[in-house]
């Protein structure tokens, strides 16, 4: 793919194109050019070499070449990175949750909290589907499928950006501070410290004397991994080397075990959280004061211990020195420096400014879409976050826009030029992309349903052409037509389904479908197709091959009045052969004559009936019978029909032979009547 100087659109180069690169002028000189046909809604089509219009006086077209008989399939790349099963899983969740909508009540803090948690639960459900796919992709890569790596990397960024948005705008838990969600995001984004490093340090003769012991412990504190911090302190060997520190270490372990940020289930209210956190911070400050008074401890050990306490106390300068990037510093500030001032996106934006300001040593790389999304989310700029999410992945953008809009964080931008909201625009584009590149029409339509007018029109235009591979697909399409009151489109769906059934030789079901669709012209066409099949095979339809068709042709009560009327020619010829097979010639003759005398019987098929009549009259059993199997009335009816159609019958020899046999029948009847 490349950009074009002439139009502001991407240009795709087809592989194995009909005309080789550099040969276009040669073909043009022969009066040819390349042409293509696009699928009604898929991003694919066929290319071929075609005659173009030219002036015959100045240019002559060369003779046809074999390459012109070939067609070449092409498709444009999909802009979606998600595998189909993830798109389907999202679609199922989307349909379940779209009807559950909560309107923000801005004057009620309790309602806003409930709203945030509600959409946080929904967000985590969608995001959990990505995690399942990531685990599966990683498993496949471990088994040697290295081509999965690009998809894994892209989806990992999508999941991480989604987790960032969830932590700030709709956390499913942590109602008293957003700091824990932000910390979880960073720990998932960049898992630190590495567990194997910790095992190596703890296996050292005296662990705290390992050169990486204190950096490792500090990292566990910065990441809020207090259980690991406690484990390191207990196994450090500090209290053995310095017994005077035992009481201090035990006190620090007790403080870490009861951190209010990591034990929010015990907290009853916001004020209770604030009280517990201030008490926790005061215990740390007091412990630091006690440690500084120690005089009989190695100064280096004492300094390292104080650094750990400074980190836990939220000392910005000390925390920054132990951080590797702005995300880590930002989350540490939220968790250790200001969890009380970390309750909403506005608070988060202030912490972000602190983490990336002039006094910070960290650089924000705005050229990476994933990082720019997180920057916008942390800066309380949801609209800009959606713009960059769109560039990273359309699936991420549409779901974030939906959640941010419904939770009240994203305004509805509507203008005369764009009369739909940003959310609706993204939903329409996402549905279009899913349909064009993956042909997942059920998924596409599930999203389009949520956009009243535009989505309705798109479904109406596309649903008659969707592939109906099984009964479930057909029922889904019909149910959607019923929901949206698309009566004409439902009839087209049934007609399409009938075509699928006919391709599988399920004619009985196809007739029922066409009858339900009220497509009587198609029903009539299929009827005569069955009529021709029956005559060509010279036998009735078998119930073993199509039980429903056999039932429809054998019992008019199984049909609606309209269906029974339209299929009567095919049903009659079926019954004719059935009676012949069961040696009921008189019954068969009644049906055959009925077809011959049928009003508006297609003249193109009349010769076939004459051949059947000729075969019937010249059947050895019929010729040698003492009881003629054609009633006198039917004989006269046949003669009358032959006289009417004489001018249209080309095979006059056949006509003469039938006349002779019918005349013999009349003689036979008069002879037996006189007796």
UniProtKB/Swiss-Prot annotation:
One Pfam entry name: Nucleopor_Nup85
Chief localisation class: cytoplasm
Keyword Transport among record annotations: yes
Keyword Chloroplast appears in the UniProt entry: no
Domain of life: Eukaryota
Classification via InterPro entries: Nucleoporin_Nup85
GO function terms (MF aspect): euchromatin binding; structural constituent of nuclear pore
GO biological process: mRNA export from nucleus; positive regulation of DNA-templated transcription; protein import into nucleus; ribosomal subunit export from nucleus
Localization per Swiss-Prot or TrEMBL: Cytoplasm; Nucleus envelope; Cytoplasm, Cytoskeleton, Microtubule organizing center, Spindle pole body; Nucleus, Nuclear pore complex
A GO CC annotation given for this chain: cytosol
Entry keyword set: Cytoplasm, Cytoskeleton, mRNA transport, Nuclear pore complex, Nucleus, Protein transport, Translocation, Transport
Subunit structure: Component of the nuclear pore complex (NPC). NPC constitutes the exclusive means of nucleocytoplasmic transport. NPCs allow the passive diffusion of ions and small molecules and the active, nuclear transport receptor-mediated bidirectional transport of macromolecules such as proteins, RNAs, ribonucleoparticles (RNPs), and ribosomal subunits across the nuclear envelope. Due to its 8-fold rotational symmetry, all subunits are present with 8 copies or multiples thereof.
Family: Belongs to the nucleoporin Nup85 family.
Protein purpose: Functions as a component of the nuclear pore complex (NPC). NPC components, collectively referred to as nucleoporins (NUPs), can play the role of both NPC structural components and of docking or interaction partners for transiently associated nuclear transport factors. Active directional transport is assured by both, a Phe-Gly (FG) repeat affinity gradient for these transport factors across the NPC and a transport cofactor concentration gradient across the nuclear envelope.
Name of the protein this chain belongs to: Nucleoporin nup85
Lineage of producing organism: Eukaryota, Fungi, Dikarya, Ascomycota, Taphrinomycotina
């Amino acid at each position: 793919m490349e950009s074009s100087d002439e139009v502001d659109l991407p240009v795709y180069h087809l592989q194995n194109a009909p005309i080789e690169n550099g040969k276009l002028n040669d073909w043009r000189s022969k009066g040819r050019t390349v042409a293509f046909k696009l699928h009604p809604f898929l991003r694919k089509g066929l290319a071929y070499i075609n005659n173009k219009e030219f002036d015959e006086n100045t240019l002559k077209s060369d003779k046809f070449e074999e390459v012109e008989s070939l067609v070449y399939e092409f498709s444009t790349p999909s802009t979606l990175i998600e595998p189909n099963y993830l798109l389907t899983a999202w679609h199922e969740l989307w349909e379940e949750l779209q009807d559950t909508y909560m309107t923000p009540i801005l004057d009620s803090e309790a309602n806003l909290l409930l709203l945030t948690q509600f959409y946080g639960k929904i967000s985590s459900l969608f995001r959990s589907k990505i995690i399942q796919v990531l685990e599966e992709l990683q498993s496949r890569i471990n088994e040697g499928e290295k081509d999965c790596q690009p998809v894994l990397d892209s989806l990992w960024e999508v999941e991480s950006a989604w987790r960032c948005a969830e932590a700030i705008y709709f956390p499913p838990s942590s109602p008293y501070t957003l700091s824990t969600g932000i910390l979880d995001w960073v720990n998932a984004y960049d898992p630190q410290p590495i567990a194997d490093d910790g095992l190596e340090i703890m296996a050292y003769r005296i662990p705290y004397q390992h050169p990486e012991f204190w950096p490792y412990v500090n990292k566990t504190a910065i990441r809020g991994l207090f259980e690991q911090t406690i484990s390191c302190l207990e196994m450090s060997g500090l209290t053995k080397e310095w017994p005077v520190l035992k009481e201090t270490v035990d006190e620090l372990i007790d403080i870490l075990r009861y951190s209010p940020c990591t034990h929010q289930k015990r907290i009853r209210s916001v004020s209770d959280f604030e009280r517990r956190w201030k008490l926790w911070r005061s215990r740390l400050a007091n412990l630091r004061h006690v440690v500084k008074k120690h005089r009989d401890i190695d100064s280096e050990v004492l300094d390292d211990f104080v650094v750990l306490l400074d980190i836990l106390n939220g000392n910005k300068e000390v925390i920054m020195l132990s951080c590797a990037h702005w995300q880590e510093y930002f989350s540490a500030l939220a968790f250790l420096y200001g969890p009380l001032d970390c309750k909403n996106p506005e608070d988060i934006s202030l912490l972000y400014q602190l983490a990336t300001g002039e006094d910070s040593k960290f650089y924000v790389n705005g050229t990476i879409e994933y990082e720019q999304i997180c920057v916008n989310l942390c800066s309380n700029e949801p609209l800009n976050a959606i713009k960059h999410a769109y560039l990273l992945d359309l699936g991420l953008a549409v779901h974030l826009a939906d959640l941010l809009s419904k939770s009240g964080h994203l305004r509805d931008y509507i203008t005369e030029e764009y009369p739909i909201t940003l959310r609706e625009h993204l939903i329409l584009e996402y549905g279009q992309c899913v349909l064009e590149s993956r042909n997942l029409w059920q998924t596409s339509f599930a999203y389009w349903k949520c956009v009243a007018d535009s989505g309705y029109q798109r479904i109406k235009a596309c649903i008659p052409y969707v592939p109906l591979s099984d009964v479930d697909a057909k029922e889904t399409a019909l149910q959607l037509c019923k929901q949206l009151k698309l009566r004409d489109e439902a009839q087209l769906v049934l007609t399409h389904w009938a075509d699928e059934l006919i391709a599988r030789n399920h004619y009985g079901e196809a007739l029922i479908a066409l009858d339900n669709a009220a497509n009587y012209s198609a029903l009539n066409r299929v009827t005569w197709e069955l009529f021709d099949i029956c005559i060509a095979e010279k036998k009735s339809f078998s119930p073993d091959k199509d039980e429903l068709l056999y039932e429809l042709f054998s019992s008019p009560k199984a049909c609606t009045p309209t269906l029974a009327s339209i299929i009567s020619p095919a049903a009659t010829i079926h019954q004719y052969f059935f009676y012949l097979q069961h040696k009921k010639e008189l019954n068969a003759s009644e049906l055959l004559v009925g077809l011959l005398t049928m009003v508006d019987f297609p003249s193109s098929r009349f010769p076939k009936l004459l051949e059947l009549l000729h075969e019937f009259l010249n059947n050895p059993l019929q010729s040698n019978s003492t009881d003629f199997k054609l009633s006198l009335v039917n004989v006269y009816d046949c003669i009358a029909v032959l006289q009417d159609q004489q001018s249209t019958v080309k095979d006059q020899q056949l006509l003469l032979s039938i006349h002779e046999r019918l005349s013999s029948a009349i003689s036979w009847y008069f002879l037996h009547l006189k007796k």
